[in-house]
């Protein structure tokens, strides 16, 4: 069931969060170094895109530790909502003393989770990201917030599941999978693959 699957994802996160401090710090430092190696770029090149099929939040945890901003399709802060807009939003700043020449903010990457996430939840017609701490024991207590209307682990947006043939060709997955070929065909887009 989705409840068992979400529990196994949370167990893997908890294993990292509760590991011996030296081992955890060493592993997270490797992750931070990896993420920052391609989050920085020259001002004329497009943002890097990170695509992952993973349901856990290890990349998000590493990005948070590194101070890396991840641009995904969620808008908002308290309970972000998924937007299918393809607007190419970015983060810029104006250097002191220079007007009219905004520059790209360093430490920003585009981020797409192709198969959903343990903290994505279907609420009526919307997809929300809930505030689920990294390494939490169970998702259920975090689904009891106002506005979630009797949500349970069965409403988590984790794929593939038994209904994947139908659901992955619908919102939000069709939008997420469109982002992949769009990023692949842009210039200066390196590929890093792992696993098999």
Give the ranges of each region predicted by the language model.
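Glycine-rich anion-binding loop/nest that anchors nucleotide
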Residues: 51-54, 112-118, 151-196
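A conditional alpha-helix N-cap/helix-loop micro-motif detector
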Residues: 24-31, 169-174
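A short acidic-Thr-Gly-centered motif at the start of a beta-strand
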Residues: 31-45, 101-104, 178-186
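Extended, H/D-rich, highly charged conserved domains that either
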Residues: 1, 40-159
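A broad, structural surface signal
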Residues: 7, 33-36, 53, 57-64, ...
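Short secondary-structure junctions and interdomain/linker hinges
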Residues: 12, 16, 38-45, 121, ...
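N-terminal accessory alpha/beta regions
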Residues: 1-22
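Generic amphipathic alpha-helical segments used as scaffolds and interaction surfaces in large
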Residues: 18, 22, 46-50, 98-101, ...
């Amino acid at each position: 069931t989705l409840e068992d699957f979400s529990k196994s994802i949370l167990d893997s996160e908890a294993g990292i969060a509760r590991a011996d401090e030296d081992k955890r710090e060493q592993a997270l430092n490797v992750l931070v170094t990896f993420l920052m190696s391609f989050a920085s770029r020259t001002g004329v090149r497009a943002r890097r895109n990170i695509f992952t099929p993973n349901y856990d939040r290890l990349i998000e945890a590493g990005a948070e530790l590194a101070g890396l901003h991840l641009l995904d399709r969620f808008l908002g802060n308290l309970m972000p909502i998924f937007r299918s807009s393809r607007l190419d939003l970015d983060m810029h700043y104006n250097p002191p003393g220079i007007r009219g020449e905004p520059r790209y903010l360093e430490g920003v990457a585009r981020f797409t989770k192709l198969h959903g996430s343990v903290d994505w939840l279907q609420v009526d017609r919307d997809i929300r990201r809930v505030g689920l701490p990294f390494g939490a024991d169970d998702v259920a207590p975090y689904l009891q917030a106002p506005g979630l209307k009797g949500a349970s682990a069965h409403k988590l947006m984790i794929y593939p599941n038994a209904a994947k043939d139908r659901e992955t060709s619908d919102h939000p997955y069709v939008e997420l999978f469109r982002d992949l070929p769009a990023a692949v065909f842009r210039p200066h887009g390196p590929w890093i693959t792992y696993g098999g």
